Amino acid sequence: NSLRVDYLSNVKLEDSTPRFDELRAELDRMQSKMWGVSVKRNKWGNDHLEHVEFTIKIEDNEEYIVRRLEREKRIGTVEKLDEHTYRFSADVYDTSEMIPWIRTFICRIDKMNFSNRTIENQFKKDLEAMYRMYGIRQEVPQ
């Protein structure tokens, strides 16, 4: 069950839960896979992770893009593939939470691979629509 904090109108302070340390440890473990607040679990309560991977290309004088990628990523890794190519990859609970951030690398993304194909396909359709709308002749990343 989820509850929006902005809908709460009355809060009463009571004793702390005896499970606080256990719950805090569980949150700490889960945060290494959380981009935002969403957590997906299967019907047995086990974590359901999605893999996100994209490759960007930079020019000679664009190291600041790599620094930005490293600085802004909340989780995951950045791997240098060659002088101009870098790969970001992460296992997350919800790929869709990352899309606004990934969009900021449009026109630099060379390849992408999301285990959640629905999100990947929607991202590509959105790019195609944007390219058509602005008359940009660029291929959508594969």
Task: Go through the PLM ranges and name each one.
Residues 32-142:
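Polybasic (Lys/Arg-rich)
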Residues 1-55:
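Core beta-strand-centered patch of the WYL/Sm-like small regulatory domain
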